[in-house]
Amino acid sequence: MTRRVAGGVAVLVTALLSAAQGSAVPTRASAQSELAAGAFAPGMSERHHYVMSARVRPLLLFWIGRSNVGDAIVTRAAAPHEARYSLLIGSDPDRAPRRINRWGYIEEDIRGDAATVVGLMTESDEESVEEAEANLQREQGGRHMFKVIHASIDAEQSQSVVTAVGAPADYSFRQVRAVLALTSDAGTAGKTRVVRLPRGTRPGFLSALAETIHAQAESARAETLHPGMPVSFVYHGKLYELRSTSAQFKPTLEVNSSKYTRAVSAQFAVKNLANGEETRFSLSYAIDGRLAEVPLTISYQPRWWMQVNLALADDVDSLQMGALDR
């Protein structure tokens, strides 16, 4: 049982970051100005901490779950005609079964009609528990590889390249800056991908999601809640569409021991516009107060037998809250 949970956590974190990392994106100046204004006032900067739990279903009849196996940190900042979003997420080897260490990071920096994206994830394309176990054994033998994406975007096109980086140790998400520093020193870059952008393409998965949530929350505050319009973005040479498939108003929402009022629970789909493949996830957020439009919960199920959940835990003392500054 523990083996299944351990492998499942590894695959879950990798799958979530594969979707989230798909956020290297450009856009037009008008759309970027709207994003920079966003849902929060220019000059503001926010950081929120989440605790991760995971569930694996070895049989069709029941789930096996583990709580507090990792963390996530979401940041957002705004200035006139500028916006910055980041997501750091991963399992914590000090808490996860078998010291599972799977994590990733993405940062989107939008300035006027230009944007840059940096994404990082542990190199582990596991499709099964068995593959996860095999990768764990290789890592114990000294193989610690990461994939790092750098993208630059303007109003017309996106250029991105993935670099393979070998780390001297089994770095966790606490060492995100150390891994990024290795890229320029010892990385092996792949072929640069260049793609022309249709008008209205947004500058990243995170910024596209923030815009979608903002429009949805505005309709909820006006008591006319609706899912909203699809938003397109680009990732490493491919175009994607983000859309909310449904949204429900919640007078109250309980998350662990916390209770929130006036929240929205929404479901989303990300579609690869080239092949039609879809990735689905759900999240909830408050529509008023200091946590307005901040995700309270996030749930993602990449396989029928696995699910990862994040819950807001700003009140939990965590050393990981300072990880982005290291």
List the predicted regions and their residue ranges.
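Bacterial N-terminal signal peptides that target proteins for export
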Residues: 1-9
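Bacterial N-terminal signal peptides
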Residues: 8-18
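Polar low-complexity intrinsically disordered regions enriched in Ser/Thr and small residues
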Residues: 10-11, 122, 169
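Acidic, serine/threonine-rich low-complexity disordered tracts
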Residues: 25-163, 212-326
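Hydrophobic, aromatic-enriched interface-forming segments
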Residues: 176-228
